[in-house]
A protein has these predicted regions:
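Histidine/cysteine-enriched polar flanking segments
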Residues: 4, 8, 28, 45, ...
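Short loop segments at secondary-structure junctions
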Residues: 34, 75-77, 137, 161-164
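Internal, conserved structured core segments that host functional sites
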Residues: 67-129
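Gly/Ser/Thr-rich beta-alpha loop segments that engage phosphate groups in nucleotides
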Residues: 33, 60-61, 143
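N-terminal low-complexity, intrinsically disordered segments
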Residues: 1-56, 207, 211
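A glycine-rich, hydrophobic loop/mini-helix early in the fold
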Residues: 39-80
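Long, positively charged amphipathic alpha-helical accessory segments at protein N-termini or as interdomain linkers
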Residues: 93-118, 146-242
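Aromatic/basic-lined ligand-recognition segments
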Residues: 125-143
């Protein structure tokens, strides 16, 4: 999360970047304004070896395990307003996955529909307008944050559906709850290598967004900014602030 925030700072200078990464160990992440205190059991997560973090972006809970996280940063006006940029980025993601044989599509957008509130429910339980699905089930969960002339959109591309863990870590849930999401493994066997997946996404971003993002090592300035931001994301006062 600290690195994503640091890359967002570079977006203020006009830089467009794409970062792809995984999590070790598995991690439960909360949306920026999601109520988590009293709703999720941090002790239970720790006993299972699961980290917990709060994202700088909005949205709902995601379990990061056997998935690939993407992070896109850019100037805030690069692709229009929040809704337009969100839709264009998600269309690029879907296009890249289709090149790998995944029947990915974007849920139709109803601009007059209500804005979803950050509830305790798992992000992957409900495909929302503008999100990437396959076979009617949610494949990618994304969220966007804008600040100081830059945007950060990141999200989880499921390789396998392990999102039931989100519900397993809820407080007071007496029965197991399935999360009807879908992972790439249900459509592609064997799974593409990280290099092949990265290549497909880079090419689709370059085509759909008309500007190929940088996908390279952090600059010294970005490393310094990430180091400063790291303390916030390791602090329980941020993670469990609400």
């Amino acid at each position: 999360m600290a690195v994503d925030e640091a890359l967002m700072e570079s977006g203020r200078t006009g830089r467009v970047t794409l970062r792809l990464y995984g999590w070790e160990p598995g991690c439960l992440s909360f949306g920026r304004n999601q109520t988590a205190r009293g709703r999720y059991d941090g002790g239970r997560a720790a006993k299972r070896g699961i980290d917990v973090v709060r994202r700088p972006t909005g949205g709902r809970s995601v379990f990061h395990y056997r998935e690939l996280t993407y992070s896109m940063t850019a100037p805030a006006d690069e692709w229009g307003g929040l809704a337009d940029a969100y839709l264009r980025i998600n269309r690029a993601l879907a296009s890249g996955l289709r090149e790998l044989g995944v029947p990915a599509s974007v849920v139709d957008v109803k601009r007059d529909g209500p804005t979803p509130r950050p509830t305790v429910r798992a992000c992957f339980r409900d495909p929302l307008p503008g999100e990437v699905v396959a076979g009617g089930r949610k494949l990618i969960g994304s969220a966007q944050w804008r600040d100081g002339g830059a945007l950060l959109q990141h999200g989880s591309i499921l390789l396998h559906n392990d999102q039931r863990t989100v519900e397993d870590l809820r407080v007071g849930l007496s029965e197991a709850v399935d999360v009807p999401a879908v992972g790439l493994a249900e459509y592609v066997d064997p799974l593409p290598s990280l290099e092949r997946l990265s290549q497909a996404l880079m090419e689709s971003f370059g085509g759909e967004l008309e500007r190929e993002p940088a996908c390279e090592a952090l600059t010294m300035k970005e490393r310094t900014a990430a180091g400063k931001a790291r303390a916030k994301y390791e602090d329980d006062a941020w993670t469990w602030r609400r």
